[in-house]
């Protein structure tokens, strides 16, 4: 099945965005096809960030109707073009975010040389401008979206194993945490470290500016003996929390974050990013581990 995708011309889209912004401020701006009659002159700034067309005859009539009548035989462009080139600021740009410090004036061309497609027509203090190219509008900050939240997970360690072992794991088994760590993650990004204290946890380091990518790769031989030897990374998640940006910033100030009651009894067991079960955080001899209370085996019967 083929999808019907509406095509958007970026040039016209930028013109339309500016038209909407101008209209919002009470200025008339329309996207339309210009007439191809008469002579036209293209203007642009020195950096070529924008370009627009003018019809010299219309401009001369707007500035001086008497001169416009006299210029019918001589050609209005022969009067307007030298004036534009010689004047430092010949007109006020009707689009506030555009610059007109140095104006580039091209030679007059017939209307047949106008570009295909619509142009943005806006009146300046000297006459009509037909914009062909415009830059993006300046970004306007709309403030922080207060409802936006980020999912954090507080990881207490991980272990590397193989697929064949998963089939032998059941309720009551203890999965040892081979690599103990106390790290805060948002999706695959490591944000920092935390300490477990009485009554909750405290985020000790939180560097949002230099977020690290989580390394989920497991060192294996170049070739695997079989599918049962595929690597599996077990991750043990003590707690999950969705936070706002303000809450995330507060965590970086070593604010105490309360854990839910009996958080140690509900540690999530993730395998390659998939939730397979949960259990209780225990210590077997000198090694932390998780005793499985719930386990989703490949057969789906939890055994």
UniProtKB/Swiss-Prot annotation:
* Superkingdom of the organism of origin: Bacteria
- What SUPFAM superfamilies has UniProt attached to this entry? Surface presentation of antigens (SPOA)
Keyword match Zinc: no
Per its UniProt record, what InterPro entries does this chain match? FliN-like_C (IPR001543), SpoA-like_sf (IPR036429), T3SS_OMP_SpaO (IPR003283), T3SS_SpaO/YscQ/SpaO (IPR013385)
Task: List keywords of the entry alphabetically.
Answer: Virulence
Gene Ontology biological process terms from the UniProt entry = bacterial-type flagellum-dependent swarming motility; positive chemotaxis; protein secretion by the type III secretion system
Give the protein's function. Involved in a secretory pathway responsible for the surface presentation of determinants needed for the entry of Salmonella species into mammalian cells.
Family of the protein in this entry: Belongs to the FliN/MopA/SpaO family.
Name of the protein described by the UniProt record: Surface presentation of antigens protein SpaO
The source organism is Salmonella typhimurium (strain LT2 / SGSC1412 / ATCC 700720)
Its lineage reads:
Bacteria, Pseudomonadati, Pseudomonadota, Gammaproteobacteria, Enterobacterales
